[in-house]
A protein has these predicted regions:
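Phosphate/ribose-recognition catalytic cores of enzymes acting on nucleotide-derived substrates
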Residues: 137-182
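Active-site segments that bind and position negatively charged phosphate/pyrophosphate groups
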Residues: 38-148
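Single conserved hydrophobic/aromatic residue that forms the stacking wall/gate
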Residues: 200-208
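A glycine/threonine-rich phosphate-anchoring loop and its flanking beta-alpha core
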Residues: 1-44
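Structural motif
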Residues: 4-6, 103-104, 166-167
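C-terminal binding/interaction regions
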Residues: 189
Length: 208
């Protein structure tokens, strides 16, 4: 069913604790990363609270445009999952208590972007720009989960298709794409190949 109306009440957000206000901003940062480079720039140059209504409208409008193009999530709509495959794994690792959804997605975005840069698919420096924006809004940029464990958890993600997972990566800020990876490709793509003792590799080491 499609919504007939989207209600936006920024005043309600003022009742949230700072941690959970920032949690929601992680999704706004995501939209800037995958679709709306001007929003990403504005989040860096201004305070989100100073243009809250415009920011929310921009995010809702971006989602509307993407969903209208791909209602069944068979193509372009997958872009909305940027950061979520590893983000869901981080949430599971923390037993849904250690990290909020936005915190986990933020780290997931960094891990995906770092892998994209490592493999020559993402413009160098993109990961650093995302990290700086997450830090500005006091969102974590690391987690204590071994990367190998996160990849194992990601292998059971609900978005898995057969023996592959569609990861969302960035060419640059505002320009995203889908990359299907087989489960066997994950360790090498994320830097956990046989030359690395990845049982001790932790997520934060891949985003420095």
């Amino acid at each position: 069913w499609q919504p007939r109306l989207v209600l936006i009440d920024p005043e309600l957000l003022s009742t949230l604790p700072p941690r959970f206000f920032a949690d929601g901003l992680a999704e706004a940062i995501k939209y800037g990363c995958i679709y709306d480079a001007p929003l990403f720039e504005r989040l860096g140059q201004e305070r989100a609270g100073d243009f809250l209504e415009e920011m929310i409208f921009s995010c809702v409008d971006s989602k509307r445009r993407i969903v209208e193009e791909d209602e069944r999530e068979s193509g372009r709509r997958m872009l909305l999952n940027f950061g979520h495959t590893l983000g869901h794994a981080i949430e599971k690792y923390g037993r849904f208590e250690g990290y909020s959804h936005g915190e986990a997605v933020g780290v997931g975005m960094l891990l995906a972007c770092a892998a994209g840069e490592r493999n020559g698919l993402t413009q160098p420096g993109t990961c650093g720009r995302i990290r700086s924006l997450l830090e500005k809004y006091r969102l974590p940029v690391a987690c204590d989960a071994p990367l190998s464990t996160l990849l194992q958890l990601a292998a059971n993600d609900k978005k898995r298709m057969g023996d592959s997972i569609h990861f969302i990566l960035l060419r640059k800020i505002g320009d995203s794409f889908t990359l299907p990876l087989s489960l066997n490709q994950l360790p090498s793509f994320f830097g956990c190949d046989k030359s690395v003792s990845y049982t001790h590799l932790r997520a934060h080491e891949t985003v420095l």
